């Protein structure tokens, strides 16, 4: 755009500069806003700019001064770099297949060092402690610093990625493997950022509800620019902006590279991210250039240097740091004669030393200082770095991510660059280096962390114990529903409604719903508990005149997450780990369509297990034939199998309200009172039926996974054992009647709330027997239940056959028939669907007769008679294939 009146332009610029000098930024911002409003009202199209020039956000004149000893910190940082490099390389000399990553921490060492020295607050009696999500691939640097601090031994460094024999270090941050060290698993890309957002949000929730003091703690999340392509990385940033989470700080290490090559070779990832975060109402702080550029910026009165910086793309910036100073002079400054003139007095070596912001401790400190003091918005720091910084041959190369070895020449260059006291003769031995106890370095490290409350990272393993009310509190569920038909979903809501009334446990219950509360009949809780809102309720709800109106409250207990399963699961993890992060044990109940649980957020569920989260996941509207009208995408027949892949997830598929009550009470006791590092997955259904009273002595079997529900004591020539769970157990009960009435066959009915728990028990017993030859073999719980029982065993569930197949090896009878709902779901009545998937009462009878015929107890013609009697089509299509 041509400047038609330069004099007038300069007058406007001078006026703005005068306002900035005399009245400050706020006044200037106000005036520019008013001018923008005037221009908009007059119909003038305003310049569109969601990004700022490619330079540091904080001017030199506004930088907070770093108070520490720069030279001592560089010395310590260099030792951390060396030990991180040595640890990875020594591990790979031991076993080349162990792997490891050098370049990520090499690019982010300064980002972490400034945090450790000045900002990461450890938990104390006065401060709850900051929550830090460390970038997974940077773990070697965190270990290396802990080694210098005396927290990790040389033997442990030697055992990096060698954990089986004990005293090793996990590859990445894993609380399950290092429960007193790592707080959060982060190496599955994208899960760290979304969890950090919801941890910060849950921190505000706890503050609003009076569980923790307000305003002290911060959540730091370190991530890579390439990681931002994961939907989970940026998918929830609008929530952080909307909720004004000023306790949240993202530090994005913009080394411009991902594993295979540039993140945005043909564009600028920092500018792209700036626009995205500014649009989501974040405070954006770019740290692009180091202090050695400041004199050049001071010379750039015409703005040509800035113009050149703005036009160069990331692929070129990567190239500059993969080459040398002469290349930078020719290809960056050589674009304009004026720029070459600007650097004519600089040698190629001095040009090469023009540093990037993420490697400059002064610039990083200023950015962090601004971030922790900023109010009303979350902050993102976009720090430009070099991948593989200091590693020589791998620096800024596309191969940098996978570099695990460095040649001797590069090692020597690394040593010299960072002043590591290792002799040439010892270089290939890659010795760890640790200053002596009492040295200046050791004292400085200890002093910096003492000023911040102690060492980091650190994880609390246990918190206060909260008593759980006795089972009798849920007596209404234990006594049955009388003549009234209700679903187990309704029973669940009643159980929660009762538990929240408990003085001790009640306030710690966190109901979480992804915009499905009305589906599950939970809208009554809106008024009772309130929906958490950081601003309360600024409007009058449309249903205010109703009993169950939509009530939002700053102290609300319910987390209503909207149509957002990943966010809801992240909230659940935040609540489920609160015992560790805040010393406040909370008991989250996240209820969702079971099909949109593990299948949708399986990676987060795995992270929950790694995080040692406590709580209940409630798979609502479960069962492939029970949620009958919704069809293929909604009908769940495999969530229990998915849940079974997580070692510390306990899963149950109860049929009756009393089973559900027993399971929830026992799970609460295990997780809240005993603080076992497990979580529960329970499926509940939307089919209404009469809920019977609990049979005497059923509690233990419910928890173990199996108990005798109905025993047929009448005389019969033949007998079978029928197993079932969920709503299909009721079909099994009806099948037992048909077997008796139509064929004179006796049938015992077993409720099996958890085939997964039966498998867990069976595997444990099998392993014990294998390891104790010569001793009396133990029996699995399945063998204890079915041993000595007459006849074949038939199992039927609303899930894939594999669910019940899991216990086959422990079933005493050779004849074990399994029915299940393999195949895609579809819409129809429950009766038709159960016939289609071959799990209804008639198919249970058919399977029982087939098993008896297989053993020779009855003639095959009896099976044929049953097929004819019940109108079963022998030529019907296999539901697995249609």
From Swiss-Prot:
Cofactor(s), by name: thiamine diphosphate
Keyword Oxidoreductase included in the entry's annotation: yes
Reaction equations catalysed: N(6)-[(R)-lipoyl]-L-lysyl-[protein] + pyruvate + H(+) = N(6)-[(R)-S(8)-acetyldihydrolipoyl]-L-lysyl-[protein] + CO2
Entry keywords, A to Z: Oxidoreductase, Pyruvate, Thiamine pyrophosphate
GO MF annotations, alphabetized: pyruvate dehydrogenase (acetyl-transferring) activity
EC annotation from Swiss-Prot or TrEMBL: 1.2.4.1
CDD domains: TPP_E1_EcPDC_like (cd02017)
Classification via Gene3D superfamilies: 3.40.50.920, 3.40.50.970
NCBIfam families reported for this sequence: aceE (TIGR00759)
Complexes and interactors: Homodimer. Part of the PDH complex, consisting of multiple copies of pyruvate dehydrogenase (E1), dihydrolipoamide acetyltransferase (E2) and lipoamide dehydrogenase (E3).
Known function: Component of the pyruvate dehydrogenase (PDH) complex, that catalyzes the overall conversion of pyruvate to acetyl-CoA and CO(2).
Protein name: Pyruvate dehydrogenase E1 component
Organism: Pseudomonas aeruginosa (strain ATCC 15692 / DSM 22644 / CIP 104116 / JCM 14847 / LMG 12228 / 1C / PRS 101 / PAO1)
Gene: aceE
